[in-house]
Curated annotation (Swiss-Prot):
N6-(pyridoxal phosphate)lysine modifications at: K87
Subunit structure of this chain's protein: Tetramer of two alpha and two beta chains.
Name of the gene encoding the protein in the UniProt record: trpB
NCBIfam families in UniProt: trpB
Species assigned in the record: Shigella boydii serotype 18 (strain CDC 3083-94 / BS512)
Keywords: Amino-acid biosynthesis, Aromatic amino acid biosynthesis, Lyase, Pyridoxal phosphate, Tryptophan biosynthesis
Keyword Lyase: yes
Protein name: Tryptophan synthase beta chain
Biological role: The beta subunit is responsible for the synthesis of L-tryptophan from indole and L-serine.
Necessary cofactors: pyridoxal 5'-phosphate
Family to which the UniProt record says this protein belongs: Belongs to the TrpB family.
Length: 397
């Protein structure tokens, strides 16, 4: 199918979906391209970001955890956004696109529940029906967010097939959309999936990096040495990276979930430890068995528990413009505790992976003068029960 925008990033991306969905994807691409040129759409989107979501978000300097080192560490506070995470940014944009296309329903998938909450709040605000697919395991471990979604009128549908996690929720959401696309918009939650979703999500998240650049120049008078973000599908990271890609002196560091350790096979790090294949409508690195079946990913963080990654990240990795590392559950948990104890901020377990890598950089070279920015992509209220149970089992509380 001929597209208006390039569906690939290098060799990654594309539109590997059933023929029945091609008209829906084409309609979405046309609506997006039109909206990007429409001052009225942009004004409405920017008004919602400012007066409903609460942008711009703060850039907070860590006062205590860098003591005794030459590291200056800032946090981009997406946790302060309405809804509790960066997810709110792009769902407002997609919900406006849905209205522009005349859709009356929203279909979404969610892992940690943050995208589900964001989809529910945007649907409630704009008068759209909303149904959300969520792995049954994630429904159990993210019960506060499930209740929030239902409070805002969303129907939450537990998915019991497969590993009962995010990848299975994605499959069910796509299956639903195949039969309902004439009235429903599929509000994909990350910078992955078939074209044009990776491009749309990147554009509707790029204000994270744009704000960060302006704020750090105002605060420090220079650009950071590196910006750091966690990577599951990759939306918060591409939102942070997008405005810095051409700033070649700024390192881009994406942090994948190392789970119980890469050597155990129980992780979610396809960029560094997967193989390229076709999944979820795109060509990208993914966790596969020897015979090409999609492997189960694992992370303490439901929002990073995804066996593939967005095509922009695959491309940035292949060109060497961005570096991708992994952080284990234990390292993320220590970073979570550190930020709580020393800065009075409770981060999401997803964001704790990015923070853990920044702290590792700080500890390994304490004498090095470095200016780092971590994208604190969400708040940790949703994770307190998970952390409580782990710490209780360890006898730490």
């Amino acid at each position: 199918m001929t597209t208006l925008l390039n569906p690939y990033f290098g060799e990654f991306g594309g539109m590997y979906v059933p023929q029945i969905l091609m008209p829906a994807l084409r309609q979405l691409e046309e609506a997006f391209v039109s909206a990007q040129k429409d001052p009225e759409f942009q004004a409405q989107f920017n008004d919602l970001l400012k007066n409903y979501a609460g942008r711009p978000t703060a850039l907070t300097k860590c006062q205590n955890i860098t003591a005794g080192t030459n590291t200056t560490l800032y946090l981009k506070r997406e946790d302060l956004l309405h809804g509790g995470a960066h997810k709110t940014n792009q769902v407002l944009g997609q919900a406006l696109l849905a209205k522009r296309m005349g859709k009356t329903e929203i279909i979404a998938e969610t892992g940690a529940g943050q995208h589900g909450v964001a989809s529910a709040l945007a649907s409630a605000l704009l008068g759209l029906k909303c149904r959300i697919y969520m792995g049954a395991k994630d429904v159990e471990r993210q019960s506060p967010n499930v209740f929030r979604m239902r409070l805002m009128g969303a129907e939450v549908i537990p998915v019991h097939s497969g590993s009962a996690t995010l990848k299975d929720a994605c499959n069910e959401a796509l299956r639903d959309w195949s039969g309902s696309y004439e009235t429903a918009h599929y509000m994909l939650g990350t910078a992955a999936g078939p074209h044009p979703y990776p491009t749309i999500v990147c554009e509707f998240q790029r204000m994270i990096g744009e704000e960060t650049k302006a704020q750090i120049l105002e605060r420090e008078g220079r650009l950071p040495d590196a910006v750091i973000a966690c990577v599951g599908g990759g939306s918060n990271a591409i939102g942070m990276f997008a405005d810095f890609i051409n700033e070649t002196n700024v390192g881009l560091i994406g942090v994948e979930p190392g789970g119980h350790g890469i050597e155990t096979g129980e992780h979610g790090a396809p960029l560094k430890h997967g193989r390229v294949g076709i999944y979820f409508g795109m060509k990208a690195p993914m966790m596969q068995t020897e015979d090409g079946q999609i492997e189960e990913s694992y992370s303490i963080s439901a929002g990073l528990d995804f066996p593939s990654v967005g095509p922009q990240h695959a491309y940035l990795n292949s060109t060497g413009r961005a570096d991708y590392v992994s952080i284990t559950d234990d390292e993320a948990l220590e970073a979570f505790k550190t930020l709580c104890l020393h800065e009075g901020i409770i981060p999401a377990l997803e964001s704790s992976h990015a923070l853990a890598h920044a702290l590792k950089m700080m500890r390994e070279t304490p004498e090095k003068e470095q200016l780092l920015v971590v994208n604190l992509s969400g708040r940790g209220d949703k994770d307190i029960f998970t952390v409580h149970d782990i710490l209780k089992a360890r006898g730490e509380i």
